[in-house]
Amino acid sequence: MTMAEVDDIGVVVVTHRSVETIDACLSRVRAATGVAAIRVVDNASDDGTLAVVQRHAACDARLRFVANPDNPGFAVACNQGAHALAQPQDASWLAFVNPDCLVETDSLARLRAHARQLDGNALVGADLVGEDGQRDPAARRRDPDFAAMLRTPAARRLDVPVDPARSLQQVDAVSGALMLLSRVLFERVGGFDGAYRLHAEDLDLCRRVREAGAVVAVANDVRVVHVRGVSSRSRPLFVEWHKHRGLWRWFRKFEAKRRSAAIRAAVFTMVWGRFPVAAMRALLRP
């Protein structure tokens, strides 16, 4: 068996009301090359998600699950899954896969190959596309600059254009829907910040990976379908609240210290002033 064929990837899938896609997600993860172990962490689903997970676990010894009695948030659950992979010492790579991501057989192995080219000192994401083939703008992002957002609305766009000349494109951040990094790097940066309940935890992790001297990049040659928003449709207000809360936390953690009191107050007003409008749009969304 060559290095490219070694099964040393531990996959973490966090679910919450994910019954629409979890069967397809796990079927594809189980068929993926290089997977040594799979850990599903369910955050108190009440829609039959756990029954689907249990069925997969019954026929694949690599798959085990944690059933949380409540919903501690995505970041906490990701850390739980990574911790649950501590025993299989052959899972030297960690892949965090959303339950609405449909990987191809070679997707994870190819992400691992890209990370290996950077001596494992990298966090790598995929070229995410919707079911309609449209690219997910969250797959390639720059860090938020909230002071710039106060000056011009255009600065609120975080997406970065794809560079077709590069198979591996360095960016500030990739989407948490699918990311792969070495266990060593994950532990070096302390994993996910569990204070994020939902949204911006991926921006935070990518920022700390870069601050640790590692590379964040998206593999433009690894395309994966991401059926966005499956879990969030049932709780639009909850999602919008924590999206805004996550952005405010990111600002306080990484940007606020170098901004004046006036700028900090203006950013607070901008972030939370936008929440009622975003919440109304979410409620009216079909």
Predicted segments — roles?
Residues 102-137:
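Conserved donor NDP-sugar-binding/catalytic core segment of glycosyltransferases
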